[in-house]
Regions:
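Accessory nucleic-acid engagement/destabilization modules that flank
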Residues: 2-251
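C-terminal helicase lobe and adjacent C-terminal extensions/tails of nucleic-acid helicase motors
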Residues: 477, 528-636, 657, 661-927
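Conserved Walker A/P-loop ATP-binding site and its immediately adjacent core
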Residues: 313-337, 347-358, 472-477, 549
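Conserved interdomain linker/interface between the two RecA-like ATPase lobes of SF2 helicase motors
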Residues: 487-556
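Conserved pre-motif I regulatory segment
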Residues: 251-288
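A substrate-engagement module of RecA-like helicase motors
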Residues: 332-404, 410-414
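Post-DEXD/H (motif II) to motif III coupling segment of the RecA-like Helicase ATP-binding lobe
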Residues: 425-434, 441-507
Length: 927
């Protein structure tokens, strides 16, 4: 039988009719081709430069490589996996060793690596190019092939008849001919650089996802038909239109006032000045300025300028927490609406609880009538096709980074430099993009180490970066700039904006600002005394930010007994309120969540609220919205109210307190918290005309352990140095004093402490240095801290790949490779048992499905109750238990574990009982 006929019997997708392997290879190549057609010209130029080709020559070459991704399916092991298909192949004369195939299974991606290397070499490509390309394409299902897999695969290859190689050669030749690619292959490039390989392996992977969807590429089409390639290309273009794949046209530079409803301040005006002569290379923009000065608007305007001048594909704004991402989401959306000019722009909210955000849910609903991807929904002919929306296809965790625009946590980006499943697709999504990294001072040494690896890759992939910070120690600033390839530059005094490109300084500006005086007062640490100190400061909208959840719960209780306050009661007490900010959104969810507890009302009418990370996700989201509505810029300002919060209120949330209490924290974080004081211009209650920060622990002896546990949250040495720096200081001038205080705290050596504290300082300093070195080393070892590690299997970064870690799963292994170090933790769903049934609520009105098939509503109901816990031994116990069978089938739920409310976890002495309180959230008790 002719090789051509034999090749057509090979199947890629089973069914009746089946989908031939050649057809799928052509479909995938067509998708890759169509994606690059839609991408900005700069993306195509990056692909062309990778191989020293013109854009017209690069397009068929890259599409050809994408089409080869499934060449491993032309193997006996794969073809034998479907009985009907196997018989057809066998009858065509392609046979195999049945015993070997049955007993030695190998994934087809492993065969792809071996076959592609062989095919490329025999068609003229040198080994130095064929080998890395084959490795990258073999990883299209998420991971590089491992040594043992390759060893077994080679046994199979040795047992194959020569006809198999001839068939694979025919497939490659037929693919090349369809694309107009001449063989033998001649590439005018010496080596395949890591960014070039990443661009190919990622494109092949997600082109495969799209080409594998029969709704876009129906089965039954004959790949031998003369018009097959052109038809596949048209199907690919239509599929991308339907998703819709981003297509952002250059629109010309707009003035700041056109995009924001106010004129730029000095900080914001400095951005276009620095970026006026942007070169063709990527840009790093560093914005260092105090809180509340419009850094976000400055960054967004900079992203607009960079996109227009450098032809970037989109924007990703990375923040420290889900709360900060939620807080910025609507502002980013409004900015993009003004910028899009009626064009359809994609915006995804990227973090674990995104579906609970009402603004994001609204964007998903807005997109659905436009989509054909979800066949359960019909197009609405009257629906507008322009504006900002969030498509179903891009809302999946691994695909979200491919969207044109995103707001999310830094973790979502950092996973790109850890070898978790499909990490390279995350990096591709950030390629040729403007990436805003906010609050870069907020990360520990380990996370900062991963951040440096991310900066290395972003520059290599042609992205521009905007680093934003209120306060950044000099050493940390130098490390981040060094990761971008910049060193030895002198910068003007703080506050400042600086731009870098090509390893050098483009320009820098000192930003003169009106000085603000912050008054410091020492405060007690005992919660009952803190509660009394706060109540003495009423009336006013007061805040208290403490260092631990247990302490927040204790302070909330110490403020006194009160009636539970539901959302219904809160809304009724203030009425319709302003039509701005988060307040209108609370009215929209009243019918669904009106009976939910959001706080308490004391006998004297004072409203008390609690916000921390140990509430189930939907309750935390509601409390977050209430907090923003009442303590934000536009809310119905309560006359007497106190918010007790943990670090979730520390960053990016637009809160404005008349007075703030804070536990002692590292100086940079302490003044980050102080940025919530008198944030906006408004009439203040009597006694609150000047901003006052009460600091717990400032007047006491510096004891941060024992029942406080502050030294488990922050380094004892940094707390000690902060405590010393603030002794005797009654005011801080912002911004004049901030940089000096920062350097004093972080550059102080043990010899700079008084005699009474020097021994303790020496010990805690050595502990700090040891841990910093260990964490920095771990980040450097585990991440892609060097570009050449992309395909390496011989360094520590390969460990995540060896464990086959999927960021959608949660088990004991995934805990070793988190984007942030700390105690092990696990996401749980608190459940109530009634007989043999489980419920999400104590009243037994919301069933929790554990078996069978789950609908979308079932999944969302379970997911919305998730809460992450880290108290020993909860994670250690639950991560050893498998999720319920129904949950394991769901990408959203497989990382969760059920937790019966009231369950006791044995320990050496007293057991730990876990309860759920409507006012306090998850509560731990020793029993």
């Amino acid at each position: 039988m002719e090789v051509q006929t034999q090749a057509l019997t090979l199947w890629a997708k089973s069914g009746d009719p089946f989908h031939p392997l050649l057809a799928h290879m052509l479909d995938t190549a067509a998708v890759a081709w169509a994606i690059l057609e839609r991408e900005p010209g700069r993306t195509r130029k990056l692909y062309a430069t990778d191989w020293n080709l013109g854009e017209k020559e690069a397009l068929p070459w890259v599409a050809f490589l994408a089409g080869l991704h499934d060449l491993g399916k032309a193997s006996p092991v794969f073809q034998a996996a479907w009985d009907e298909g196997a018989k057809r192949v066998w009858d065509a004369g392609l046979t195999w060793d049945e015993e070997l195939v049955r007993e030695q299974w190998v994934a087809h991606g492993v065969f792809t690596e071996l076959y592609v290397k062989d095919v490329l070499k025999r068609h003229g490509l040198p080994l130095r190019l064929a080998d890395p390309l084959a490795k990258g394409l073999g990883a299209h299902h998420g991971f590089l092939a491992q040594g043992e897999e390759l060893k077994t695969a080679r046994l199979h290859v040795k047992s194959e008849a020569s006809t198999w190689q001839e068939v694979r050669d025919h497939l490659a030749l037929r693919l090349a001919q369809s694309l107009g690619l001449n063989l033998p292959l001649v590439l005018p490039v010496e080596d395949a650089e890591a960014p070039a390989i990443l661009r190919v392996m990622a494109l092949a992977s997600f082109a495969d996802w799209i080409a594998s969807d029969p709704r876009f590429f129906p089965y039954g089409r004959d790949p031998e038909a003369l018009e097959y390639w052109q038809d596949a290309l048209e199907l690919a273009r239509k599929a991308l239109e339907d998703l819709p794949w981003p297509r952002v046209s250059p629109r010309g530079v707009r003035r700041f006032e056109e995009l924001f409803p106010f004129s730029p301040n000095p900080l914001q005006s400095s951005v276009p000045e620095l970026l006026e002569k942007t070169p063709g290379d990527s840009v790093l923009l560093l914005v260092e300025a105090p809180m509340g000065l419009g850094k976000t608007e400055a960054a967004l305007y900079a992203s607009h300028l960079l996109r227009e001048r450098l032809d970037h594909r989109g924007l990703y704004v990375a923040l420290p927490t889900q709360a900060t991402a939620n807080g910025l989401f609507n502002r980013i959306r409004e900015f993009l609406e003004r910028l899009s000019g009626g064009e359809r722009w994609e915006l995804q909210l990227q973090h674990g609880a995104a579906l609970l955000n009402p603004q994001y849910a609204e964007l998903l609903e807005r997109a659905r009538p436009m989509e054909v991807y979800d066949l359960e929904l019909e197009r609405n002919p009257g629906q507008e096709s322009g504006g900002v929306a969030a498509s179903t296809w891009f809302s999946a965790k691994k695909r979200a980074m491919l969207a044109g625009h995103g707001v999310g946590t830094l973790d979502q980006a950092l996973l790109g430099v850890l070898k978790v499943k499909h990490h390279f697709i995350r990096l591709w999504g950030l390629m040729n993009r403007v990436v805003v990294l906010d609050e870069v001072h907020a990360y520990d040494t380990y996370t900062s180490g991963l951040l440096k690896s991310l900066l290395l890759w972003l520059r290599a992939l042609g992205s521009s970066v905007i680093l934003m910070t209120a306060t950044l120690p000099k050493k940390k600033r130098e490390e981040l700039l060094s990761a971008w390839g910049v060193g030895g530059v002198e910068l003007p005094p703080y506050p400042r904006v600086a731009a870098f490109s090509g390893g050098g300084l483009l320009g820098a500006r000192h930003v003169p600002l009106e000085e603000k005086t912050l008054h410091l007062q020492g405060a007690p640490t005992e919660v009952s005394q803190v509660a009394e100190a706060l109540k003495e400061q009423l009336p006013g909208a007061l805040g208290a930010i403490v260092n631990t959840v247990d302490r927040a719960q204790a302070l909330y209780q110490a403020l006194g007994e009160g009636e539970r306050l539901t959302l219904d009661e809160l809304l009724d007490s203030f009425g319709a309120g302003p039509n701005q900010g988060a307040w209108p959104g609370l009215w929209e969810i009243r019918e669904e969540k009106g009976r939910w507890v959001v706080g308490k009302r004391l006998k004297d009418g004072t409203l008390v609220f609690l916000l921390h990370a140990r509430f189930p996700a939907e309750e935390r989201a509601l409390r977050e919205a209430v907090t923003l509505a009442l303590f934000g810029k536009h809310g119905p300002r309560p006359e007497k109210a106190i918010l007790v919060a943990t670090q979730v209120a520390e960053q990016s949330l637009d809160l404005d307190f008349d007075l703030l209490y804070s536990d002692l924290a590292p100086v940079d974080l302490l003044f980050q918290r102080a940025g919530r004081l008198h944030r906006h211009t408004r009439k203040r209650p009597e006694g609150h005309q000047t901003p006052v920060l009460l600091v717990g622990g400032l007047t006491d002896e510096p004891e941060f352990g024992r029942e406080l546990h502050w030294n488990r949250v922050y380094e004892d040495y940094v707390l000690l140095s902060t405590w010393l720096a603030l002794q005797g200081r009654e005011t801080v001038k912002v911004p004049a004093d901030l940089e000096g205080l920062l350097e004093e705290v972080y550059e102080r050596l043990p010899e700079g402490f008084p005699d009474s504290l020097r021994d303790r300082a020496r010990k805690s300093y050595q502990n700090l240095i040891d841990r910093l070195q260990k964490d920095a080393s771990m980040a450097g070892n585990l991440s892609l801290a060097e570009l050449d590690r992309l395909l390496s299997q011989l360094d520590a970064s390969a460990l995540a790949s060896d464990f086959r870690l999927d960021d959608e799963e949660e088990n004991a292994s995934t805990q070793r490779f988190l984007t942030r170090l700390g105690e092990p933790s696990v996401s749980v769903v608190p459940l109530y048992r009634r007989g043999e049934e489980w419920f999400l609520d104590a009243d037994g009105r919301r069933p929790a499905k554990m078996k069978g098939d789950l609908g979308k509503e079932d999944v969302l109901a379970l997911w919305s109750r998730a809460v992450r816990l880290s108290r020993f031994p909860i994670p250690q116990t639950l991560l050893g238990e498998k999720p319920p069978s129904a949950w394991a089938k769901s990408g959203l739920l497989r990382g969760l574990r059920p937790l019966e409310v009231g369950r006791e976890f044995p320990r050496k002495e007293l057991a730990l009982q876990v309860d759920l309180d409507p006012e306090l959230g998850v509560v731990y008790r020793l029993v």
